[in-house]
Amino acid sequence: FPTRRSSDLKDNVICVEDEGRGMPVDMHASGVPTVQVIYTVLHAGGKFSTEGGYKTSGGLHGVGASVVNALSEWVEVTVHRDGKIYRMSFSDGGREVSKLEVIGKTNKTGSKVRFKADKTMFSTTKYSFHQIAERAQEDAFLLEGLKLVVRDEREGKEREEVYHYEQGLVAFMEYLHEDKQVFHKPVAFSGMSNDIKVDCAFQYTDEYQENIFSFVNIVRTKDGGTHETGDRKSTRLNSSHS
């Protein structure tokens, strides 16, 4: 994944930019540019492909980009790839406004997406900086080494937060327990089985109530799941032998 990603908020327009390899712009088997498929076709992601898929992805179904497009007044996609700058735009829930075109040259790589939510689809289109920043910080903990910059450029609300953690889940533990009495340093480990990577960290404190934060594909699973059930069993087994 890219080493840096930024999210800007101005005039209630979201702008997300990264320094990755840039979304693919070559022709898809369906006869349209791949970037267009990403933003107009459900389940078009490659997160479950074992060859050429994503190493890191968010969510499960591969619908994020196309759903954002469907629920936006307009979307503008800019891609820096192979020495060229590409741009494509949509409006009114995904209608193509301008075809993918080359608008310049570049010596960098990455993608930038700007969009404005369709106010007819939501009760409010005013964004909470706190919620966006909180999610960005979680991502930074889970994707160690990635720098996330969140900026609010709305008049009278200007602020910026930068999140960057080289120690990932260890840093997450330290953040969660910074005002608590702990009994040891955070313990972190990871493993791979059947192409599924699992990362885990834990730390015992003087609190009676346990707190478990579980994620799948960097999305919080507040309702738990088999991954959380397995973690609870393993920590209880560890406690019984302590």
What are these regions (language model features)?
Residues 9-10, 104-114, 202-217:
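Flexible hinge/switch segments at interdomain interfaces of large molecular machines
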Residues 97, 130, 137-139, 145, ...:
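GHKL/Histidine-kinase-like ATPase module
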Residues 1, 106-110, 195:
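Short, solvent-exposed loop/turn segments at the edges of secondary structure
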Residues 1-6, 237-241:
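Short, small-residue-biased leader/transition segments that mark boundaries at the very start
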Residues 38:
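Short basic (Lys/Arg) and small-residue
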Residues 3, 109-111, 221, 235:
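Ser/Thr-centric signal marking residues that sit
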Residues 43, 61, 227, 241:
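Histidine-centered active-site/metal-ligand motif
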Residues 10-34, 45-175:
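GHKL-type ATPase core
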